[in-house]
Amino acid sequence: MVNRINPKAIKAGGTLNLFEKYLTLWVALCIVIGIALGKLLPAVAQTLDSWSIYNVSIPIAICLFFMMYPIMVKIDFSQARQAVKAPKPVILTLVVNWVIKPFTMVIFAQFFLGYLFAPLLTATEIIRGQEVTLANSYIAGCILLGIAPCTAMVLMWGYLSYSNQGLTLVMVAVNSLAMLFLYAPLGKWLLAASNLTVPWQTIVLSVLIYVGLPLAAGIYSRYWILKHKGRQWFESQFLHYLSPIAIVALLLTLILLFAFKGELIVNNPLHIFLIAVPLFIQTNFIFLITYVLGLKLKLSYEDAAPAALIGASNHFEVAIATAVMLFGLNSGAALATVVGVLIEVPVMLMLVEICKKTAFWFPRDPEKATLLDPRCINQEIRI
């Protein structure tokens, strides 16, 4: 039996490509390559990091821009106007992402990394001239992940879970705009509460460079291309050739990061697992909260599933970029954000399957979905 595409629904998302499907494998390869680079050519990473302006590494900034821009150019911000037509799921995702999720991430990170696993994380590192324990540095990375709701791969999660992709696009647009204004103040406040001093100007500059600049470039170039080249050329040609650039930029950033952190990982492979514990629990906890709230609000499954999935997943590109700028490429905070990348795909695919298996809990409105649920299609139109 083959799933049927709904011709009436908004086309967004799709099946995972080779990179996205095996993201965990590529990150693991980057760990190996980065560690080898750090061991064999230790001067390379230091030289690259020395090319900086106001503590912003130019090579890394370039990589991070090309990692972020393809994500931003894919977002249709005109969909944000549609939020008034579906207020309940949009309000739900905003409340979860910006009122609940940041604080539960702090609680889980502090409990596991700052208390339970603290005896295993007693080493320190120097960040901006300040001696910081690895535990606190890892907590900072977790916080930066926790306040960055996913706006990219969630389209794929929504598609695979038979969700309302029109609503998913609305939530992506609204959360991206919210991130531009809320990420810096929330990050500053929560990091300060975790005994990590971050200059206000630095985190604002980080958001402007790694969110604002790609966002502005994405909005303008999307508008210009759609106006002069048309949607078909934009989707079939421009995005087709742009996606590999984002992949290469992400992989280069990860290789450089692990070139710095190679020795720590070789000596303490347990750290990767320890960081993954609060991230895994946070992802599942937020998913459960949002999913249950969607049930209580009497949302249809097609609206509740993407709301839960966008809350559960993280915008790891923004988190990596911010951690690198605030704490440095060789910081524990940057390493913690990469652990988020490492577990993202397998955990989210697990949650997609949970959504599909529990869809019967909710009222169904299958015609909203781009990929129709075969369980909701009449036998005669199954292919």
From Swiss-Prot:
It is found in: Cell membrane. Pfam families: SBF. Keywords: Cell membrane, Membrane, Transmembrane, Transmembrane helix, Transport. Signal peptide: none annotated. One of its GO terms (molecular function) is antiporter activity. Belongs to the arsenical resistance-3 (ACR3) (TC 2.A.59) family. It is a multi-pass membrane protein. Coiled coil: none annotated. The chain crosses the membrane at residues 25-45, 53-73, 103-123, 139-159, 166-186, 200-220, 238-258, 272-292, 309-329, 332-352. NCBIfam families: acr3. GO terms for cellular component: plasma membrane. It comes from Synechocystis sp. (strain ATCC 27184 / PCC 6803 / Kazusa). GO terms for biological process: antimonite transmembrane transport; arsenite transport. This is Uncharacterized transporter slr0944.
